[in-house]
Amino acid sequence: MTEFIGSRISLISKSDIRYVGILQDINSQDSTLALKHVRWCGTEGRKQDPSQEIPPSDNVFDYIVFRGSDVKDLRIEEPATTPSAPPVQPPNDPAIIGSNSGQYNWNQAQTAQPPQPVQPNPYGAPYQQAPPAGAPYYMYPNAPAQFVPPGGLPLGTPLDASTPAVPYYGAPDQQQMGQRPEFAQNVSQGFAGQAPYNVRPGYGMPSNQKPPNFAPGMPAPGPTAVSASPSLQSMPPTNGVIPGAQPSIEASIEKESTSIRNSTVTNDRVVNTTVDVSQSQTVETSGPSKEVPTTQPDASAAKPRTEFDFQTANQKFQSMKDDLLKGKNDEEAEEFYKPKQSFFDNISCESKEKGMEAADRRALRDRERSLNMETFGVAGSGNRGRRGRGRGRGGRGRGRGYARNQYNQYRNSNGSQPRAQPANDQ
């Protein structure tokens, strides 16, 4: 399906709406196809119900992706245009200097009209008119010098084998002609007996390139079989220089020469400064050399003569570890439980109270009474009196019995069962 990419596609969906666009992409994994520059044509009477018909639209969508399962019909209206073949390149031959992909027509080049004479340009450099249609390659501006025919020859004229290869140079301006008056004389002497070339300005090499200086003793080339065209010989030569622009050109050349002289002086100063710096560096380096501190290995570090014995070192380490563990086991473990300072060893009991002295028991009861008062708000159970012994001590026994009744009332208030009160002996 990739060969249909770029074709104009007419697509009808299951909604009976037709779309026309250019096939952009086909995704077989997602079962989708994409169209670009899509136009919506509507249902076009496929609904068979005027109320459900969808009219077309003039809007063009840039990109639409369609699901393949929802496509009802697909038709190719215009196939994809085949791309133009790439231009044929010449072989990689060092003998080829330049090439042109177009076919050269010699007959058309011979009948081509010569370029119009150069019009004076008020801004200095002469400008050129566009060459006629079908003109050869060298008639265009900025053409390489090797494609330019010798001056005075008609365009497209074949050269004889005896014609020497004479490079073509543009007409120099007046100032260059004034500076080199021997140029015209040498050329006329060197090419005596040959038809003079009518040099046309504006073609060939730029004006800032200096022509070669022919020596007077240079042998003249042989005669050529090609003569200059009469129409070109009758054409008056033009130098392309405006008379009124001569002072401005001389002033600009004077400024350029001044700037060149200034730059030359500056370059001389820079060269002298560079020489002075190099001489000063030479003088400094010729003096006594300073020692540069370098990092050298310590000679006192002795290198081991034998390899390290890992087995012996591991045994030694294991013995040291065993000694340390044995010393820790020999030490007395820290005592965390101290009976004299522990809370549970100070709990009062009857056997402990009996073993105490009377003063110790009294102090213990006072402390317990104060703790009870602070904790419960009641001092304690009071004195545990005993019954009086004998009749003579009956009053004391009854008094003790009254204290016993108070103790029972205290226990009843705290939720305990009252004890049976023994009868007082009368």
Curated annotation (Swiss-Prot):
Residues 350-371 have a biased composition (Basic and acidic residues). Residues 384-401 have a biased composition (Basic residues). Residues 296-332 form the DFDF domain. Residues 1-80 form the Sm domain. One of its GO terms (cellular component) is cytoplasm. A motif (TFG box) lies at residues 360-380. A motif (FFD box) lies at residues 335-351. Residues 226-237, 279-298, 405-426 have a biased composition (Polar residues). One of its GO terms (biological process) is stress granule assembly. It comes from the Eukaryota. Residues 79-100, 204-305, 348-426 are annotated as: Disordered. GO terms for molecular function: mRNA binding; mRNA phosphatase activator activity; translation repressor activity. Required for G2/M phase checkpoint control. This is Protein sum2. It comes from Schizosaccharomyces pombe (strain 972 / ATCC 24843).
